[in-house]
Curated annotation (Swiss-Prot):
Carrier of the growing fatty acid chain in fatty acid biosynthesis. GO terms for biological process: lipid A biosynthetic process. Its main location: cytoplasm. The keyword Transferase does not apply. InterPro entries: ACP (IPR003231), ACP-like_sf (IPR036736), PKS_PP-bd (IPR020806), PP-bd_ACP (IPR009081), Ppantetheine_attach_site (IPR006162). One of its GO terms (cellular component) is cytosol. Belongs to the acyl carrier protein (ACP) family. Pfam families: PP-binding. This is Acyl carrier protein.
């Protein structure tokens, strides 16, 4: 697991109040991890803070799974 993947999974677990072991790459935030729309907004904000990036709304709407979040952070992180 890459450092970015580990950081993303930690953020997701903290934001959604689930065990980190439940946060696997194929899990969807809403269907599998019980997130609601406010949770997903807060999750995007936490990812922005962690990785020093800005996620436009049209991109945020496409980040619906753990793998989507890992891929987006990997591609767009500022260092």
């Amino acid at each position: 697991m890459s450092d970015i993947e580990a950081r993303v999974k930690k953020i997701i677990a903290e934001q959604l109040g689930v065990e980190e072991s439940q946060v696997t790459n194929e899990k969807a935030f809403v269907a599998d991890l019980g997130a609601d729309s406010l949770d997903t907004v807060e999750l995007v904000m936490a990812l922005e803070d962690e990785f020093g990036i800005e996620i436009p709304d049209e991109d945020a709407e496409k980040i619906t799974t753990v793998q989507n979040a890992v891929d987006y952070a990997t591609k767009n992180q500022k260092a």
